[in-house]
Amino acid sequence: MPLPPRLAYALLIVSACSAPDSRIPALDGSLALEIRYPRPGEAAPAEDSVALWGTVGTGRAKLMVNRVRVNVEPNGTFSSFLALPPGRSPSLRFVAHRGNDSVVRTILLRRGTPNSSADEGTPVSEGTVREWGRWVTMRRLLSDTADRATHLRPIYSRWRPGGEVAIPIPQGVRLFANARTDRSIRLRLASDEQVWVPLADADTTARARPMLLRAGPPQLRSDSTEMLISLALPERLPSTVELSGDRLLWTVYGAEWTTRPASRDGDSAPIRRIVPRNAAPGRVVVDVGLVSLPLGWRTEWREGALHLRVRRAPLPSKSLHGLVVALDPGHPPDGTTGPSGLSEDSVTLAVALVAADKLRQRGATVILTRTSGRPLSLEARAVVAEQSRAHLFISLHLNAPGPGRPPSAVYGTQTYWMNANGSALARLLLVEVSKAMGQPAIGMYQGEFAVLRPAWTAAALVEGSGIVIPEREAFLRTQAGIDTYAQGVVNGIVRWNRAADARALPVSRRR
């Protein structure tokens, strides 16, 4: 139940005026007001409150924002959550003073809407949807020559222009576009399924082909590390792989079997049985029954066939010898800056380097997505996850509150997973990082992150702590803070490697 406006406002004032944190080292510098957040022109959420953080340069200064006193920590930093004045263009007036010296800044904001996103376009905003009949080849333009990962990644289609991600479509695939807007085209995948992609990612000079291509029967091969299921096809087609309880459902679009191939048994774990079926005109499914949770899976095209590679999970072990771990220090570009100016990307790199050293001492092989402050795109990080031989992929981050949420909301550790093979890793990292950092475990969540899309490894994203909280930022400035975060990551990996339940299949969903 929402709080009455006056009570909510009073609680915000009490929060802003809380006592200074004695764990933060004192700093007696010059008066210098630096507002890290919000930035001028920032969209103010419809909740009518805004988080703010920054520094006044000295712990001996006082700060007022819109005539509300905001607590200044011993090192001069501040972090608070204040009500906004009404109107379409609210403002925040900061007044910092120490003795006879004072600094005044005004931040102009613009009113936003609840749960809004600048990326959330619609067909209407792109112009009228009109019929279109043309074969196209998916091909992304290489816009950044410094980052050649772009041409290796699929194009992620959406259920509507600017909407939720649908399925990945490999570059080079030829599909039929039956409608378009000014900037997007609609692709026919099957008789009952279609998706949207940017027009810029399509070569519209493609030759026509039959609407449905005949697929060969599934062929199975295996070795000590993986199993390979292959479908012969005249050319590459888009496909998806979904883990549903104790089954992997491999759906291939634009294919058909004139006679359904026979089912067959798998020869060993993790595959129990393979059942092919025509799901709908233009969509075939290879239903792969599982004995245990695979380490990962991916599809690839080579030698005239579409292949599903299913990795065997390593056996539980107390030793890390033979384990390959990919660590991804989150950002740059972007990333959050803490109240005193500590950058998220500098901390995540330091943590990754320490964690890598600790893991190598235990016998693991470690791959780092970056070893310097040079920006690296999400596409390039995802390529490392999918092209490497890593068993685990862990993306390291620090947290900041979303619009309309107070800084206190990120006091603790959060983890994210996307594919089910990363769920156990996310759970164990949540427990161990929060325990090491001496802070709450906020929770683990399933999230759609670009770096977690590849299912080839068990992958998780860790928000180790809230960098916008002055005490946490001050701790992360120290070597002890870096070592502590890194040790929590290592402990989570060690527990994953030992745990038999990390290889357990998720509970089956009823169909």
What are these regions (language model features)?
Residues 2-10:
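Sec-dependent signal peptide recognition
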Residues 14-16:
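C-terminal motif of bacterial Sec signal peptides marking the signal peptidase cleavage site
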Residues 18-29, 59-62, 69-325, 351, ...:
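Short linear recognition/processing motifs and adjacent strand/loop elements at protein termini
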Residues 18-45, 49:
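Short, compositionally biased P/S/T/A/G/V-rich stretches that sit at domain boundaries
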Residues 43-51, 224, 281:
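Short coil/turn motif common to extracellular beta-sandwich-like domains
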Residues 309-384, 388-392, 402-405, 409-411:
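Active-site histidine-acidic residue metal-binding/catalytic motifs
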Residues 332-334, 371-376, 398-403, 420-423, ...:
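Solvent-exposed loop/turn segments at secondary-structure junctions
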Residues 395, 402, 414-416, 445-511:
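Active-site-adjacent mobile loop/cap segments within catalytic or ligand-binding domains
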